[in-house]
Amino acid sequence: MNAIWIDEQLETSARVQNSMKIEREDHKLEKRLCREVGRAIVDFNMIEEGDKVMVCVSGGKDSYAMLDILLKLQKRAPINFELVAVNLDQKQPGFPEHVLPEYLSKLGVPYHIENQDTYSIVTRVIPEGKTLCSLCSRLRRGILYRVAGELGCTKIALGHHRDDMLQTFFLNMFFAAKLKGMPPKLVSDDGKNIVIRPMAYVTEKDLTRWAQVQDFPIIPCTLCGSQENLQRKQVGNMLRDWQKQYPGRIENMFSALQNIVPSHLMDSKRHDFKGIRTTGVADPEGDKAFDAEEFMQAAPAGRAVIGINPLAPG
């Protein structure tokens, strides 16, 4: 009897300790997410005093997490800014229209649902079997720009993360022959909106875990999510394989996006190769043309490069 009682006590104690460990890990994850989003906001001056930020919420894990983190930072930020969540209901068959309004109402955040049947347009114009993403994205972009103006928003926040940015860089290199990525902040192509990506420093792995912790009511994208062999998926798999084989490579590649040397590429629009002249003065930072390149064995890249104070201590 005593042995059974002791076993039960030990089992209960183990469960309590495991629960406490999970809580600690979840708290660390929350702090890391807030810190990394805060750093991006500060690094690129994404949100300023008096801004009204339109937070685009699709129903996926990334946009849910972005809204959640921005709400947390809003409470502790040294500046005042507004948030309004916006969802574009594209009238996809089976789309659960009630999910987002119920979630956002419960959250207590101002929100707007824009109803536009882009689904019919995309499926009518794009041949069966072809990727729908490009046209869908263009239609969605135009609508969201208009809505931002109607709501008086000064910034549009998108939920792209670090992995998205790296994938875009390689997609442009492989399929468009461009060294072009996904900027953390830009002026929209209509010249009227500033678009920000507050989760530029956040990993998809952390977002996946946070979605589980918060139990977000995820809405799958049935319009394009079922299409296999998309180029982005292929590039994503390639990057994940690299990271498994060479841990730290993803961090180094991401840091490289912030450490560009135009004079060592081949774009004459970015560097005046034709006008190069000798100066007769030694430059310790100059190029050693005949020396082999020296590379770090392991660079702590990623977070060391972006170590700037977030909006508030966390």
From Swiss-Prot:
Subunit and partners: Homodimer.
Alphabetical keyword list: 4Fe-4S, ATP-binding, Cytoplasm, Iron, Iron-sulfur, Magnesium, Metal-binding, Nucleotide-binding, RNA-binding, Transferase, tRNA processing, tRNA-binding
InterPro entries with a match to the protein in the record: Rossmann-like_a/b/a_fold (IPR014729), TilS/TtcA_N (IPR011063), tRNA_Cyd_32_2_STrfase (IPR012089), tRNA_thiolation_TtcA_Ctu1 (IPR035107)
GO cellular component terms given for this protein: cytoplasm
Note describing how the cofactor binds: Binds 1 [4Fe-4S] cluster per subunit. The cluster is chelated by three Cys residues, the fourth Fe has a free coordination site that may bind a sulfur atom transferred from the persulfide of IscS.
Motif (PP-loop motif): 58-63
GO biological process, one term: tRNA thio-modification
Pfam family, one: ATP_bind_3
Residues involved in [4Fe-4S] cluster binding: 133, 136, 224
CDD domains membership: TtcA-like (cd24138)
Cofactors: Mg(2+); [4Fe-4S] cluster
A GO MF term: tRNA binding
Protein purpose: Catalyzes the ATP-dependent 2-thiolation of cytidine in position 32 of tRNA, to form 2-thiocytidine (s(2)C32). The sulfur atoms are provided by the cysteine/cysteine desulfurase (IscS) system.
Family: Belongs to the TtcA family.
Functional pathway: tRNA modification
Coiled-coil spans in chain: none
The protein's name in its UniProt record: tRNA-cytidine(32) 2-sulfurtransferase
Gene this chain is encoded by: ttcA
